[in-house]
């Protein structure tokens, strides 16, 4: 082990550690971090060298965070990244400091937002919040309005998770939707992601994503937001249905084919006989 450590540079160790961290299953960041910490055995190197991995993980996972003094949770995403570990909460018009290791928010400060897109963002945010409340038992969303390459763009992010470590599984749903405000119609682009980890008596992961394209009629803010949500609802329902159907098919065919129909002896086991033999033997020994 010592020879191996001598041959591997600190840079390579950090690269490997960062890879483990960015691929941590949802809800298991701390477990992976602690394991990597033991393997690396150098806290300073890990914190300094892999800090970008901590940030990337939280942004990729749409990590929700509660800001003290504010009711709604906000998602940590690349769209809200202001640099220097500060992030935007467009709903409350504030920025805040985010600790990527502790996953805690602090130092909320007022933040200027694009006033020309205020009504568009608020209409989409209001419609999306109602949708998420109806469809996700533990869901959160954040809507951004930005100028990207000179185009006024709405970006909607959704996150929902269920962490059940006592039952040996964790899962997260993420979706991201964009459209540009370009009347009379605009292209809607979305990506849907599901990641589930089940690890009781085994280690099984579901990692799935789907890209979606559609178009929305751009009229006034409220009507466009309504049509935008209809597209999201249809695509997400369709995706969830397809996932369920695929699992049923796999259960009926693929997984069934993996199971051995008969033991190696090619003879079915008569469990009742085995039980009677065992009882008889125990009675003999009594």
UniProtKB/Swiss-Prot annotation:
Pfam families attached to this UniProt entry: F-actin_cap_A
Domain of life: Eukaryota
Gene3D superfamilies found in the cross-reference section: F-actin capping protein, alpha subunit, F-actin capping protein, beta subunit
Positions bearing Phosphoserine: 9
InterPro entries: CapZ_alpha, CapZ_alpha/beta, CapZ_alpha/beta_2, CapZ_alpha_1, F-actin_cap_asu_CS
Sites bearing N-acetylalanine, chain numbering: 2
Modified residues (N6-acetyllysine): 19, 97
Protein name: F-actin-capping protein subunit alpha-1
Organism this protein belongs to: Sus scrofa (Pig)
């Amino acid at each position: 082990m010592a020879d191996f450590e001598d041959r591997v540079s600190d840079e390579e160790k950090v690269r490997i550690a960062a890879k483990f961290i960015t691929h941590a299953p949802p809800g298991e960041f701390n477990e992976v971090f602690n394991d990597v910490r033991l393997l690396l055995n150098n806290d300073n190197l890990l914190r300094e060298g892999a800090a970008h991995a901590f940030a990337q993980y939280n942004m990729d996972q749409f990590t929700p965070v509660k800001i003290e003094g504010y009711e709604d949770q906000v998602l940590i995403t690349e769209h809200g990244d202001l640099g220097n570990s500060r992030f935007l909460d467009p709903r409350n018009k504030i920025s805040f400091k985010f600790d990527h290791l502790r996953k805690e928010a602090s130092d909320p400060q007022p933040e200027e937002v694009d006033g020309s897109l205020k009504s568009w963002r608020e209409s989409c945010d209001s419609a999306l919040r109602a949708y998420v409340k109806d469809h996700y038992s533990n869901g959160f969303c954040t809507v951004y309005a930005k100028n990207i390459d000179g185009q006024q763009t709405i970006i909607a992010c959704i996150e929902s998770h269920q962490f059940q470590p006592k039952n040996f599984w964790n899962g997260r749903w993420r979706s991201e939707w964009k459209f540009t405000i370009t009347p009379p119609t605009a292209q809607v682009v979305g990506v849907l992601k599901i990641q589930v980890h089940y690890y009781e008596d085994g280690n099984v992961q579901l990692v799935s994503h789907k890209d979606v394209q559609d178009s929305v009629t751009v009229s006034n803010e409220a009507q466009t937001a309504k049509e935008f949500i209809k597209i999201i609802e249809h695509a997400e329902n369709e995706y969830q249905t397809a996932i369920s159907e695929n699992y049923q098919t796999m259960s009926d065919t693929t997984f069934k084919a993996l199971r051995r129909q008969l033991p190696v002896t090619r003879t079915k086991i008569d469990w009742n006989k085995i039980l009677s033999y065992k009882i008889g033997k125990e009675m003999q020994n009594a």
